[in-house]
Design a protein with these regions (language model features):
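Polar/charged low-complexity regulatory segments
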Residues: 1-65, 70-86
Length: 86
């Protein structure tokens, strides 16, 4: 199992920090509850509205999954306009 992420160092700006625990994610299907498949899973959250690198990350993910999850690929392209240049 991976080491837990450190907490935010409030003496540093976000630009001066690497990975740290910023969010507590709970799945809506209940599978993040104790004993379930996704209990204690680590998630990487992207702020689609404010992160200048979000579109590039979304595009890379959509392209990576398009053969195995074609509907997810199409949904991401349509919702986030990923057919447009980054």
């Amino acid at each position: 199992m991976r080491q837990q992420l450190p907490r935010q160092d409030r003496t540093k700006s976000n630009n001066d920090q690497g990975l740290y625990k910023k969010f507590q994610v709970t799945r809506t299907d209940g599978t993040s509850n104790p004993g379930q498949k996704h209990y204690q899973c680590e998630y990487f959250v992207i702020d689609i509205d404010h992160d200048p690198y979000a579109r590039a990350a979304l595009r890379a993910y959509a392209l990576a999954c398009r053969n195995t999850h074609p509907q997810l690929y199409l949904d991401m392209v349509n919702r986030y306009g990923l057919d447009e240049p980054v």
